[in-house]
């Protein structure tokens, strides 16, 4: 039980840290003054981690509800 709670808290903390980490980065220059404006997707890992965090938080909430009902 304590392990599950600790794991959920760890996942939530990691989500918060990851979101704070991603706010300071600038996209690369990419030659925009020369007309080279290609669409590049930079945040694939962020979306994957946010999906994992969402799954973890939903799972934790479901576990807490089942524990409260017992």
Curated annotation (Swiss-Prot):
GO cellular component: extracellular region
Domain of life: Eukaryota
Keyword tags: Amidation, Cleavage on pair of basic residues, Neuropeptide, Secreted, Signal
Annotated GO biological process: neuropeptide signaling pathway
Signal peptide: 1-22
Primary location: secreted
Compartments in which it is found: Secreted
Sites bearing Phenylalanine amide, chain numbering: 34
Tissue specificity of this protein: Expressed in antennal lobe (AL) and gnathal ganglion (GNG) with expression detected in most animals (at protein level). Not expressed in corpora cardiaca (CC) and corpora allata (CA) (at protein level).
Residue positions assigned to the propeptide: 38-70
Family, per entry: Belongs to the FARP (FMRFamide related peptide) family.
The protein's role, per its UniProt record: Ligand for the neuropeptide SIFamide receptor.
Protein name as catalogued: Neuropeptide SIFamide
């Amino acid at each position: 039980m304590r392990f599950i709670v600790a794991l959920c808290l760890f996942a939530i903390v990691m989500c918060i840290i990851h979101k704070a980490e991603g706010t300071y980065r600038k996209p690369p220059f990419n030659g925009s003054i020369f007309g080279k404006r290609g669409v590049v997707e930079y945040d694939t890992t962020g979306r994957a981690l946010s999906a994992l965090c969402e799954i973890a938080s939903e799972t934790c909430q479901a576990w807490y509800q089942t524990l409260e009902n017992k």
